UniProtKB/Swiss-Prot annotation:
Disruption outcome: Defect in seed production due to female gametophyte developmental arrest.
Sequence similarity: Belongs to the RNA polymerase beta chain family.
Chief location bin: nucleus
Species lineage: Eukaryota, Viridiplantae, Streptophyta, Embryophyta, Tracheophyta
Enzyme class: transferase
Listed name of the protein: DNA-directed RNA polymerase I subunit 2
GO molecular function: DNA binding; DNA-directed RNA polymerase activity; ribonucleoside binding; zinc ion binding
Amino acid sequence: MVVNAKDSTVPTMEDFKELHNLVTHHIESFDYMTLKGLDVMFNRIKPVSVYDPNTENELSIWLENPLVFAPQKESFKSTSRKEPLLPFECRQAKISYTGTFMADVCFKYNDGVVVRDKFDFGQFPIMLMSKLCSLKGADCRKLLKCKESTSEMGGYFILNGIERVFRCVIAPKRNHPTSMIRNSFRDRKEGYSSKAVVTRCVRDDQSSVTVKLYYLRNGSARVGFWIVGREYLLPVGLVLKALTNSCDEEIYESLNCCYSEHYGRGDGAIGTQLVRERAKIILDEVRDLGLFTREQCRKHLGQHFQPVLDGVKKESLSIVAEAVLRDYLFVHLDNDHDKFNLLIFIIQKLYSLVDQTSLPDNPDSLQNQEILVPGHVITIYLKEKLEEWLRKCKSLLKDELDNTNSKFSFESLADVKKLINKNPPRSIGTSIETLLKTGALKTQSGLDLQQRAGYTVQAERLNFLRFLSFFRAVHRGASFAGLRTTTVRKLLPESWGFLCPVHTPDGTPCGLLNHMTRTSRITSQFDSKGNIRDFLKIRKSVVDVLTGAGMVPSLPKLVRAGPPKVIHVLLDGQVVGTLSSNLVTKVVSYIRRLKVEAPSVIPEDLEVGYVPTSMGGSYPGLYLASCPARFIRPVKNISIPSDNIELIGPFEQVFMEISCPDGGNGGRNNSSLATHEEIHPTGMISVVANLTPWSDHNQSPRNMYQCQMAKQTMAYSTQALQFRADQKIYHLQTPQSPVVRTKTYTTYSIDENPTGTNAIVAVLAHTGFDMEDAMILNKSSVERGMCHGQIYQTENIDLSDQNSRFDSGSKSFRRSTNKAEHFRIDADGLPSVGQKLYPDEPYCSIYDEVTNKTRHMKRKGTDPVIVDFVSVDMKSKKHPQRANIRFRHARNPIIGDKFSSRHGQKGVCSQLWPDIDMPFNGVTGMRPDLIINPHAFPSRMTIAMLLESIAAKGGSLHGKFVDATPFRDAVKKTNGEEESKSSLLVDDLGSMLKEKGFNHYGTETLYSGYLGVELKCEIFMGPVYYQRLRHMVSDKFQVRSTGQVDQLTHQPIKGRKRGGGIRFGEMERDSLLAHGASYLLHDRLHTSSDHHIADVCSLCGSLLTSSVVNVQQKKLIQEIGKLPPGRTPKKVTCYSCKTSKGMETVAMPYVFRYLAAELASMNIKMTLQLSDREGVTD
C-alpha cells in the first residue's frame, strides 16, 4: 500500500478490510462456536444415570453452561491481576495460545435438587482475531504495540509457538438428497442394486448422520444409517408406517402421486407405471411381518434396537423406537410428519433414477458440496469427547458400586466428585489441542466424516502469499489422493466463480487442492451486521413468503400431486409444500427481488435453486438453502432496474442465465435473455492468480506455475520480523513494488509484503551461459544489493526439558571459567548479538549445579552465521530457563540460485557477469540487470511478460504505475466512458514509449561490452518484476569424497546433514551403460562405493564358508637393521572342503556378500565359478 507523505505513516484498518474478508469464514465459525455453538451442543448431550440397587437411588449427571475464557498469563501471585496473553509472547516462548474452558457438571439424586459444580476442562485453543483474542478490535497502532503486523488478519491457532491453520475440507451438501450410482451399493447384501439416494443430515449442533435409501432389484427399498460403527438397514415401508398414523392407502397415494396418465416423459413426468407396483411391494413387506399399525411398527423397531442403544434398557419398546427415529433418521428435522414427507420425496427421486426419468447427481460437483469450517469440526469433536467423558464417569461409578470392599458412599456427593476426578476433565482441552497440532481425529464413531487425518497444516510464512493461500485453500479430502481415477480431480463447470481454475498445484494434489476465487465466500451463522442468525425465524419468514406467493403447504391428509403439474419446494431439507409449475418462475423472480432489497425478510445469501422439469434431466424441484458452510459469490441482477448485487450459490448457478461483461449474449436466443451478469471477469480466479499481470495473454500452464512459484518466493514475509521466533524465515532485503500491477495489489494491500524486484531484463543470446532457461545476472547489480536476502533460523533451548524430576532447576545459563571462550559467550552464558559464529563453535553455555560441569551447545551446519537476536524467558525461576537464539544466514545471489518472473519463466543464475562486459545502450547508458535467452518465449507463449516489459518501461519514464488487470478488452467501460477501445493494448503501451523517444515496440540498440561495437540486431529490453525463489544452492549443494558408510551394506550413507553422498540411481547407471563407459561405471558402483576383498573357495564356489587359521611364525634368525618384524601370514581355509588349496581372493561389492548371507538364511546356496583372465576354470 502506497502512503502519501501528508498521510499518517500508520495505515488504518479500513485499508485492510478486503484482506480481512478473505479469512472471515474461519473466524466467524470459531466465534459462533464460543458464543452459541457450545450451548447448543451441550443441550444435545444426553445425561448419564447411575443406579444403586442397594439404596435404590439414581444419580443423574449432565453438563451445562460452557464458558471459554480469553487467554491470560500465568500468575504466580494469588493477589495479582491476570494480564492478557499476547500472541507474540506465545510464539517466542513456544507455548500455546489458549484460554480456560469451564463448564457446570450437574448432579441430581432421583427427583431432588440439582447441584452444580464448576469443572476445569483444560486449556482451549483460541483462534487469533476471534472475539476471545486479545487482538480483537485493535487498530493498526495497537497491533504495532502488540508486536504484530498492521495487516494481521488472524484465522489461525498458535500451538507450542507454531502457527497452524484449519484446512477447509469438502463435504457433501447438508440436508440435500443426492442420487448416485455406485457399484459398492450392490455389495451390501444379496438383491441390492447400484442405485441409492444419500442425504447427509446435520443437526443444529453441526453433528451429522448420513441416511441412505438403497434400491432393491425386486422394486423395494431399504433405509440405512450407521450406529456405533455398524450400518442398520430397515424396510422403507416399516419406517413410513412408524413415522405417522397413515393407512396403507394414504402411503400408496403418496408414493404414486408422481405418476399421472395425463403426462408423458416428454412433458417432464418423473414417474412411471412401475411406481404403483413398487408401492405395493413396499406395503406387502410390512404386511408380511404382521405389522398393521404405527404402534406395532414402533414396537418392532424397539425390539431390534433396544440391545443396540445405550441407556434404554428400562424404557418401553415404543420409546426406544422413538429414540431411533429421532436420533438417526433425518436428524435435521424435529417433526415426524416432516420426516415422512422427506422420505416420500426421496423414494420418488430414487424411483425416478431407476426408471431413467432423471439423471444421477454428481457427488464430485461443487453443486452438491459444502465446506467443513473449523468451528463446526471442533464442535462435533468436542461433543464426542464430552460424551466419552460422561460415559467414563458412569463406568467409574458402576465399578465402585460393584466393589464390595470399597468405602465409597454413593449418597455422598463429595465421594462422587472425588471419584470423577480420577477421570481428569482437563484431558478434554488436551484432546482439542492435539487435534489442532496433528490434524488427526481420534474417534471411534468417525463423526460421519470422510477422513480422520489431515485437518490442520502448519501455516508457513515463507512469504505472505503462501500464508494467505492456506486460508483460501479447499481440499477435496485425503481419502481421494490414493484413488486411481481422475474423476474427482476434473475441473467441472459448476465450480465457475467459486474455485479458481488456475490456482492448483501440479503433481499429486492437482485438482484435489483448490483455492477459492477472489469474490467467493462461505456463509456462516452471522448476518452482514455481525448478529447471530435465528434460522427458525428465517425459515418461518421464507415459508410465509412462499405461501403468500401461491405455495400449497405440506399438511397431513392433504391430496398430493407431483411433477410436472406441481413441483416440490424444499427449504434446508424440509419439504415445505408444492408450487404449480406455472407459478414457479414468477415466485423465483419475486424471491430474488426480495433478496436484494435492504430491509428484507429474506436473507441476502438464501440459495434459490430452481430445477425445471425436463426430459431425463435433473430431478425437478425448488431447493432453498439458508444454512451455513455454503459457497456464495456476488453477481449483478440486471432483471431489476437498480442493478443490485445478489449473492448466489453453486447449486442455483447451474440453472441461471448469467452473462459475462463482454456485452454479448453468449449464444442465447431472445426467449432466454440473461437475468444476471458477472461483476468482473477476474472474479473467477483467486487472489494469487489475480496478481499475474495480463494473465489472459499467457498460456494457462504458465499461470498455474506462477501461482506455485509466487508461494515459493523469498520475500518480505512479515513486518514483525524482529519479534518472531520461527524455526526458519526467508527475508528479502531489498524488495520493491512492481511498476506493472493489477488492481488486486491495491485492493488487498499486497505492497505491505512485497515479493520481488524490478530488474532491467534484456532478451539476448549474449553468451553460451543463457541456454536452457539459465540467466545471467549483472555482477555489479548484485553487489549493490539486488535480490539480497537472509535466512533466519531460531534455536530454542529449554532447560526445563533437560532437567530430570529429581534435580529440577539445577541447570542454568552460565559461562565457563575457561577464558579462551569468553570472547564467544557472554557472562550470562549466551552469545552476544551481532557475533559471527563458524561451524562447531560454541554459542551457548549450560552449567549443571549437580555435577558442577559446564556443557556447550555448538553451532551445526557448514556456513558461518550472525547472531541476530537473543531472548530469554524468566518466568518464576531465579535464572532463565528458556532462551531463543536467532541466527542470520546471508543469502546473496550466487550461481545456481533460482529466479522467476511473474509469468512462470523460471531459471537459474548461470553467471555473475561483470558490469563492464554487459551490453549497453549508447544513448542512455542503460545496462541490463539480467539477460535471458529469447528461446524462452516461443514455446511458452508468455506474451504478458513482453507486455510487462514495454509497460514497465513506459511507466518508469512517466513516473506512474501501469494497470495490468487481465481481460481489459472484455470489460465494459462505465462512468460514461466508451465501451471498448479500438486500439490494441500494445499500441497503447507503445505510445507511452514514443512520447519519451523510445522505440514503439520496446527494442533498443545496444553496444557490445567487449568490443564497443553496435550489435547487429535490436534488443528487446525493459523492466520486469522478478522473484527470487527459495531454492538456493547454499541450502542444497551436496558433495563428499569420503565419509560415513552404512554399517549393514558398507555403502555411503544418504542425507546432506549427515555428510552423505548423492544417490547414483538407475537413470545414472543407464546413461553410463548407453555411453559404454564401463570403467567409469565400475568406479562409481564398486570402487568408490562398497569395494570389498572376499575369500572364495574355488572348489565348492562358496563365499560364506571361509575362515582364518592362525599360523605360528618362526623366530627370525637375524634381524635386518632396526626394521620391525613382518606381519604374520594368514591362512584361509574352507570349512566345507576342509582345505585351503582352492582359496582365492576376489574383489566384489560388499552388498553382494550381504545378498549371499540373506539368501543363505532362506536355505538358498549361492555358488561362484572362478576363472583366470584367459577364461580357464580352476
